[in-house]
């Protein structure tokens, strides 16, 4: 099943469908598949959504204006404009674990900006929310943008705990 989803996702990226949303319960392989797809793209970027949103919000209120995010070049301090330049230029971006925490208004603004900056470019977003709970978690405007692309629902038992029981 995941190979089929990966192939469909690659085709959607090739057709410039964006964003691609992998949704489903905890442990069903969404993040794993997103990372595997990202490995097929040199210079793809993958970040935790809560981490990125928090870092950018902190940068906007810090004296230095720097964002502390591990960068692919080994640097961990980027200005907000450097982060956005890298985010926009990547062939594929993955935002993992959207909606694991409630968003502040500032984080919602940053998320909206991230989605707008990747419009028409490869973007995979993973979330535990379904279509209905997504809008409750991130708001109607952001949910509308997320659902404008393509979605896949991952179903089944938590693969991590199932492996641990064996």
What do the predicted segments below correspond to?
Residues 17-21, 43-44, 92, 122-124:
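Residue-level preference for the first positions of well-ordered beta-strands
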